[in-house]
Design a protein with these regions (language model features):
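Alpha-helical tetratricopeptide repeat
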Residues: 2-182
């Protein structure tokens, strides 16, 4: 389960970087890229230093708080990570992925009710967020709520199937467009 949660952190970090970086600020984009590279290569102290420096320049950037939270989790600083997740959400309350990640962190800290609230908020913001349903199911299983956990897993599986079909269709369309150009 710990490896699964670790992979979830990495996946969401990469998704968040791809979706949230301000393309107009090359310096910030470069910093986020370096932070991600350092973090993904498990150079957490260097990544934390780079993130702290970037936060001095961009103190209201939710993505940087998210990255710092992720790094602090790897360093075993869960309480600081939770504060950074809270800050990321206060700066960007409409990002369902950050709620999912904070929910995972709360669950690891034993706050299953807080985790459920975060997963529910993530679903409210993005009803197609399969990870929110999957993680909510995990917490419900831990609480012995097996029926509702199964319902969440069913929804998550359907959403994942839809995502896979959409990705396949996009690839087919891209290949067709590429072949038309030849």
């Amino acid at each position: 389960m710990k490896k699964l949660l670790g992979l979830c952190w990495l996946l969401f970090c990469l998704m968040l970087s791809a979706n949230c970086a301000n393309a107009f600020d090359r310096e910030k984009l470069q910093a986020v890229s370096e932070i991600g590279t350092l973090s993904n290569s498990q150079q957490y102290i260097l990544a934390l230093d780079k993130c702290n420096s970037a936060l001095e320049k961009y103190p209201f950037d939710p993505e940087l708080f998210y990255w710092r939270a992720t790094i602090n989790i790897h360093l075993g600083e869960s309480k600081q990570a939770l504060k950074d997740m809270d800050m990321a959400i206060s700066l960007n309350p409409n990002d369902s992925n950050v709620y999912v990640m904070r929910g995972i962190l709360k669950s690891e800290l034993g706050d299953n009710d807080g985790a459920l609230a975060d997963f529910e908020q993530a679903i409210k913001l993005d009803p197609k967020n399969s990870s929110a349903y999957s993680m909510r199911a995990c917490v419900r299983i831990a609480k012995g709520e097996f029926k509702t956990a199964n319902e969440d897993l069913d929804v998550a599986n359907k959403l994942l199937d839809e995502e896979e079909k959409e990705a396949e269709q996009k690839e087919i369309e891209e290949n067709n467009n590429k072949n038309k150009g030849d």
